[in-house]
Structure formats: structure tokens, C-alpha cells
């Protein structure tokens, strides 16, 4: 593309028009038009692609309108939006606003026990991000389609709480951690350690409290439902049906949400979901509460297991590590993979579903931004970083001379890539 500003503006403006036209045509074809755009993973491929292109083009056009002063202004706004959402979550405003109908600011402030003027200020800033809306008579507030979903979906509620109670405080200690421990790779010398004044690793901290364990597991489940991390990308990244009735070991599989998605799409596969005992107990209960068909649940079993211990399931078709190894430094990542090697059968594969960092500017900025965000989140919580393909290859070569990354695939619109590792 021509790098002249006029050419770039013309390019992205035409993409907005073309993409929006296709999306509008799809919306008008529906019997009941939704109030928000459906996830790009739940619509026809062409429409999903148009949504991705629209987001990227709009993002780039917005960038062109900002001079340095505007950039700093927007950063200030973004910080205050985050602060406002955290405030609204802390005082349970999302759950206190009725899912249907509206409530006055006066009554809401009384129920929440917060000053009415502060409540109004926080909600009205959130409204600029399509969270809440004023409805009916002056002084009445109601849910927007987005905030209603954030209030009613239990996994999104957990994600919101995790963001407010853990992610935000940790990020504020990023500078302090680097100043205190420059260059450290220790699992207990992180921004999270400073934010919560503890001396173990992040996962030690989580495992010490069952409530933290459940909140973290539920938030990870919620993340997997967003379009960029949707489990449907994993379903499309490999010919799973070629495994027949093989066993997939879902290591660190938390609530089993990934195995459930695969089981629903591939009716012959069987699954063993492994995680820490507290997580397993909660996950079994959640699976029972979901009342899924027996054709799905009878093919999924849970097993307490530590990633660093030898893999007890022998000869499985696939050992799946989805968003697991990025939480661990290279040494421990190698140890986890080595724990699988003795269990491998002649045709067994190891699947790593994780971010593969691209060259700067080589993919859409809306996708790269999320990858770079995750890169820093990992550093702040676990003193690790996301990896490039060369980093992944170096780790696999340290595990065994007989293992190779044979295939790497990133489904369009996905943040995660699938790395297929086989014995050679």
C-alpha cells in the first residue's frame, strides 16, 4: 500500500464502506436483528472476515485523526475509564441495576451506599463505552446490551472481578517491579508480588485460596468465549476427526471448557481434563450443573494432576497445552514437555495452543495489540513473556532431539496459534 497519508486514508475508508455494507446486508437478512454485532465466530465466514476488517480499518482511521496531544488525552481518558469500571464493579453497580427496566440515580446510590453525584459521574463516563444507558424520565439509568451481558453471564462477572481485583492493581506495580528486580526471571519477583505483598509464585498465591482458584478458572473460561480466543478456532485448526476415538489429554484444562467444545464438535473423541485437585472438584460440579447431553459428558473425565509431574495417561492421541506454557519460564516449560515424553505412543502428538509473537506490524494492529498486551500481562504476573516461533523451536529442541514442530497454524481472527509437535 502507498505510504502517503491520502492513500492510506482512502484505503481504510474504502475498507470501512465495503465491510460495513456486507455486515449490514447480513443483519437485514436476519429474522430478528440483534442490538449488537454477533461474535465474528458465530456468523458466516465472509461476515466474520468483514467484521475483522471493519475493526482494523476503523482503528487505523482513528489513529490518523490524533496528534500527539490527542494521544495523551486519549490515554488519560482510557485510564479513567478503567478506573470507573473498577469503581462500578467494586460497588456492584452492574448487579444493582435491574436487568430489565430502569432505576433512578437517587435510588441506586442509596442501595449501593455511594454519593449520587459520584455514581452519576462514573456511570456517564462508562456510557461513552456503551456500558449502561439513560432510559425514560431524566435521572433514570438502565443496562445497555453490553452491560446487561456483563451483569448476567457468571463467567463474565468472574472475569470482570478478576480484572478489577487482580489485573488492575498488578499493572500499577509494573514500574516498581522492574526497579526492584531488574532483569529477574524469578516467579516470585513480579508486579503481582508487590501488588499483593506475597512471596510465592502467582499460581501458589491462587492455589492457597479456593475462592481465588474458582475466580481465576471462571475468568479463563470467559476469555475463551471472546472471538479472539474462541475455542472454535482450535476446532478449525486441525483435522480432529482424523483421530477417530482417540484420547485427548487437556493438560491444565481448568473447567474443561475446551474439551467440551471439542467433544460437541467431534463425537468420537474422548477427553481427560487435568488440573489441580481444587480446580477439578469445582469443574466436575460445574459440568454437572450445565446439564449437557450424556453423549458429551460421558466422554469427558477429570483427573487431578500437576503439570510438573510425570504424565500418567499413556499413549493418548493428543496431549493439549492450551494457554499453559506461556505462564512458565523456559526451564519449567521444558520440564512440563519432558514429563509428557515417556507417555508418548508411536502416533501421539503434543499440541501447544498459544500466542506466537509476530514481527512488529506484520499482522492487523487490532490483533497485535492484544498479543502485546498479553505479553506484558504475563511479565507482570509470572515473569514470563509470550514467545516467537524461534523461541518455541528452541524450547522443543531442549526437550528431546526426537521432537519437532511439524505444523504451525493461526486461524483467521484468532490470537492463538496451534503448534503440532511430533516424534521424528
Curated annotation (Swiss-Prot):
The keyword Ribonucleoprotein does not apply. Disruption phenotype: Leads to the accumulatio of aurasperone B and fonsecin B. The keyword Disulfide bond does not apply. One of its GO terms (molecular function) is O-methyltransferase activity. S-adenosyl-L-methionine binds at residue 275. Keywords: Methyltransferase, S-adenosyl-L-methionine, Transferase. GO terms for biological process: methylation; secondary metabolite biosynthetic process. Pfam families: Methyltransf_2 (PF00891). Pathway: Secondary metabolite biosynthesis. The active site is at 326 (proton acceptor). Its EC number is 2.1.1.-. Belongs to the class I-like SAM-binding methyltransferase superfamily. Cation-independent O-methyltransferase family. O-methyltransferase; part of the gene cluster that mediates the biosynthesis of aurasperone B, a dimeric gamma-naphthopyrone. The first step in the biosynthesis of aurasperone B is the production of gamma-naphthopyrone precursor YWA1 by the non-reducing polyketide synthase albA, via condensation of one acetyl-CoA starter unit with 6 malonyl-CoA units. This is O-methyltransferase aunD.
